[in-house]
C-alpha cells in the first residue's frame, strides 16, 4: 500500500485462495418465507430446522441464491412427523413475493406409506410417484444444474428417482433457492 503496509510470509507457503468455497455455508434464512413461527424452529446457526406439528404450511428458504451454475445441498431427515414434507428448489423471478408451489421441483416425503414423489410446480403435477420410503437419519441430496435444467435427488449418496431434465427454459432468468415446505 501507499503507507508501506505490506505483508510477507514468515514461514510456509502463501496460497492465493480467490473463489475458494471453503467455510461458506448456505443456511436457512429465517427472514424469508411465511409462517416461520410456529412452523419451524431454527437452531445450529440456522443449519437445523425442525418442523412443528402441524407445520402450518410453512416455507423456509436458503440465504444464498444463484442464476446460473451447478449447486448441491444435503438435508438430514433426523425425524419425521405425521405431516408431508417437501425438500427441493424454488426459482424466483425477482424478490420473493409468493410462497406457493409455482416454479419448484420438490421431493415430497412422509412418515408412512409410499407417498414419496417428485413434484414440479412448473407443470403442476408429479413427475415420479410411488417411490421407496425414507427413514429417520437419511441424508437427502439435491443436485441442480441451472444452465442445463436438471435436478437430481439422492438418498444416502445413491440416486433417488430419475433425473429431472428439460427444465432449462423454466430455470432461465430466475434465481434458485433451496427450499423446504411442511
Regions found by a protein language model. Give the residues of each.
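PRY/SPRY (B30.2) beta-sandwich protein-interaction domains
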Residues: 1-182
Amino acid at each position: 500500500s501507499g503507507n508501506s503496509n505490506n505483508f510477507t510470509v514468515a514461514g510456509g507457503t502463501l496460497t492465493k485462495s480467490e473463489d475458494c468455497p471453503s467455510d461458506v455455508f448456505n443456511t436457512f434464512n429465517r427472514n424469508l418465507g411465511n409462517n416461520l413461527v410456529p412452523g419451524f424452529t431454527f437452531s445450529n446457526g440456522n443449519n437445523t430446522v425442525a418442523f412443528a406439528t402441524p407445520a402450518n404450511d410453512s416455507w423456509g428458504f436458503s440465504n444464498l441464491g444463484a442464476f446460473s451454475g451447478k449447486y448441491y445441498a444435503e438435508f438430514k431427515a433426523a425425524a419425521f412427523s405425521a405431516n408431508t414434507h417437501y425438500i427441493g428448489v424454488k426459482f424466483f423471478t425477482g424478490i420473493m413475493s409468493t410462497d406457493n408451489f409455482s416454479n419448484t421441483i420438490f421431493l415430497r416425503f412422509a412418515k408412512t406409506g409410499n407417498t414419496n414423489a417428485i413434484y414440479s410446480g412448473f407443470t403442476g403435477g408429479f413427475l415420479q410417484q410411488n417411490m421407496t420410503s425414507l427413514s429417520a437419519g437419511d441424508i437427502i441430496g439435491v443436485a441442480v444444474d441451472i444452465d442445463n435444467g436438471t435436478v437430481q435427488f439422492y438418498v444416502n449418496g445413491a440416486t433417488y428417482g430419475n433425473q429431472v431434465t428439460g427444465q432449462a427454459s423454466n430455470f432461465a432468468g430466475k434465481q434458485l433457492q433451496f427450499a423446504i415446505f411442511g
